[in-house]
């Protein structure tokens, strides 16, 4: 039996994909057997890693787990491939539509699947703290302010929506503010405001590697699980 997990990285040309490739190459528990990019002219090998264009997805070699940080338009094909090959999928692709989220739930009946808007340990802890604050602060206002780099397209961010769900389930309706500026990796502020007082809970990511390390940790732990839709915090904390 191999001592490493065979890894497919989907969205390998993006910021997260590049971090994943670098960190996985430094981790002996992983071997990247395929990297999929949307704009590759044809399959090729770079630094020992086979690269495939998105159109060649069906031709990728066997893998034990896939990590996906791509765009919504490429997500459905990867999900179908993982289901067809009965392989776990870890995805951080945001901006999915309602039909794609429904497909995620259906796929969870057949494979172990993790979808998350944020794979850092700190964000997982923040979601837990926000849930606890929501229990204690009924009737308070809640505002969620997220800041990201100018190239991020979706707003509010997936992480902000996850935080909003954590308070909404406590009966508090959150309000969102999105900022796009410079090269901000990711800042999230959750503010609870009452009469004469307020509480602020903040998470700031200063390096994209925190998300890549978290995704690799989750990928390692989801292999061998029974089919189901798992939360990041189920596996990372």
UniProtKB/Swiss-Prot annotation:
| Compartments, record wording | Cytoplasm
Report the principal subcellular site: cytoplasm
Please give the Pfam families that the UniProt record associates with this protein.
Answer: DapB_C, DapB_N
Q: Which of the seven top EC classes does this enzyme belong to? A: oxidoreductase
Sorted alphabetically, which keywords does the UniProt record give? Amino-acid biosynthesis, Cytoplasm, Diaminopimelate biosynthesis, Lysine biosynthesis, NAD, NADP, Oxidoreductase
Under catalytic activity, the entry for this protein gives: (S)-2,3,4,5-tetrahydrodipicolinate + NAD(+) + H2O = (2S,4S)-4-hydroxy-2,3,4,5-tetrahydrodipicolinate + NADH + H(+); (S)-2,3,4,5-tetrahydrodipicolinate + NADP(+) + H2O = (2S,4S)-4-hydroxy-2,3,4,5-tetrahydrodipicolinate + NADPH + H(+)
Q: List residues binding NAD(+).
A: 11-16, 92-94, 116-119
MF-aspect GO terms: 4-hydroxy-tetrahydrodipicolinate reductase; NAD binding; NADP binding; oxidoreductase activity, acting on CH or CH2 groups, NAD or NADP as acceptor
Stated EC number for the protein is 1.17.1.8
Q: In which pathway does it act?
A: Amino-acid biosynthesis; L-lysine biosynthesis via DAP pathway; (S)-tetrahydrodipicolinate from L-aspartate: step 4/4
Q: Which GO cellular component terms, listed alphabetically, does the Swiss-Prot or TrEMBL entry include?
A: cytosol
The residues that hold (S)-2,3,4,5-tetrahydrodipicolinate are: 149, 158-159
> What does the record give as the function of this protein?
Catalyzes the conversion of 4-hydroxy-tetrahydrodipicolinate (HTPA) to tetrahydrodipicolinate.
PANTHER family given for it?
Answer: 4-HYDROXY-TETRAHYDRODIPICOLINATE REDUCTASE 1, CHLOROPLASTIC-RELATED, DIHYDRODIPICOLINATE REDUCTASE
> Which HAMAP family does the record associate with it?
DapB (MF_00102)
Similarity field: Belongs to the DapB family.
Name used for this protein in its record: 4-hydroxy-tetrahydrodipicolinate reductase
């Amino acid at each position: 039996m191999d001592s490493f997990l065979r890894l497919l990285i989907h969205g390998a040309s993006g910021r997260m994909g590049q971090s994943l490739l670098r960190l996985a190459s430094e981790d002996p528990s992983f071997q990247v057997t395929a990297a999929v990019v949307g704009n590759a002219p044809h399959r090729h090998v770079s630094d020992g890693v086979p690269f495939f264009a998105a159109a060649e997805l069906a031709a990728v070699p066997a893998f034990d787990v896939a990590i996906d940080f791509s765009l919504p338009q490429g997500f459905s094909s990867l999900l179908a491939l993982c289901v067809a090959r009965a392989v776990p999928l870890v995805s951080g692709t945001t901006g999915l539509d309602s039909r794609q989220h429904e497909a995620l739930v259906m796929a969870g009946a057949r494979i172990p699947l993790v979808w998350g808007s944020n794979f850092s340990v700190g964000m997982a802890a923040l979601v837990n703290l926000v849930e606890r604050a929501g229990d204690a602060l009924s009737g308070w206002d809640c505002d969620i302010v997220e800041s990201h780099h100018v190239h991020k397209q979706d707003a509010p961010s997936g992480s902000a929506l996850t935080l909003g769900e954590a308070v909404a389930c406590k009966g508090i309706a959150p309000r969102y503010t999105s900022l796009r500026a410079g090269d901000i990796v990711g800042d999230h502020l959750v503010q609870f405001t009452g009469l004469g007082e307020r509480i602020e809970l903040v998470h700031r990511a200063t390096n994209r590697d925190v998300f890549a390390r978290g995704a690799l940790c989750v990928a390692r732990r989801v292999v061998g699980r029974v089919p189901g839709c798992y939360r990041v915090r189920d596996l990372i904390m």
